[in-house]
């Protein structure tokens, strides 16, 4: 019992270390991205930083929501089922429940999310969304620490790509005189996203 508790605490510590590195990398990436936006002029500076904070909020919201759903439907990094008493022999049903819950979460916040964050027509955004779904599913099949943290890193990198490819990344409103997106004024492809 004590050994299992120590292993669990060690896992939590490693996970928090990885999560801290995750956030530091995100901060560095977004700072580097914002420093290259030379088109931002003085009248739009307040709107620029306000909407940058909104982008951070959406990212952390989805990250915490994803982790909460993962803990709710699964237990630990080995992908063992959380509800052992539930008579669902097919593990695929748990994946269906997980993604249904994620879609329900998006539906609840559709007015805030779909209009501002998911309005995008770039190929990069679609590629990032597909790979994010794929890598997040692979986390549940990991059976050791290496596989768990490796797939978590894949999700982290894909999240960066996902955010940077969003057309409405800075959510500038044309009615206020700002550009729809400073980054989207030039056509993006898979190879010219700056940090990737």
Curated annotation (Swiss-Prot):
Tell me where in or outside the cell this protein is found.
Answer: Mitochondrion
A single GO CC term for this protein reads: mitochondrion
Organism, by scientific name, is Paramecium tetraurelia
Which keywords appear in this protein's UniProt record, sorted alphabetically?
Answer: Mitochondrion
Q: What is this protein called?
A: Uncharacterized mitochondrial protein ORF2
């Amino acid at each position: 019992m004590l050994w299992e508790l120590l292993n669990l605490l060690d896992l939590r510590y490693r996970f928090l270390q990885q999560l801290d590195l995750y956030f530091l990398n995100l901060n560095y990436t977004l700072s580097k991205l914002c420093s290259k936006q030379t088109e931002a002029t003085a009248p739009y500076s307040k709107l620029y930083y306000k909407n940058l904070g909104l982008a951070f909020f959406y990212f952390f919201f989805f990250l915490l929501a994803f982790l909460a759903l993962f803990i709710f439907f699964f237990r630990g990094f080995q992908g063992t089922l959380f509800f052992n008493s539930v008579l669902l022999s097919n593990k695929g049903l748990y994946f269906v429940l997980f993604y249904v819950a994620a879609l329900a979460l998006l539906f609840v916040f559709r007015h805030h999310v779909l209009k501002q964050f998911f309005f995008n027509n770039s190929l990069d955004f679609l590629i990032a969304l597909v790979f994010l779904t794929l890598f997040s599913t692979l986390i549940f099949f990991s059976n050791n620490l290496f596989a768990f943290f490796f797939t978590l890193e894949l999700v982290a990198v894909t999240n960066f790509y996902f955010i940077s490819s969003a057309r409405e990344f800075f959510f500038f409103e044309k009615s206020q005189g700002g550009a729809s997106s400073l980054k989207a004024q030039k056509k993006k492809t898979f190879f010219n996203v700056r940090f990737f």
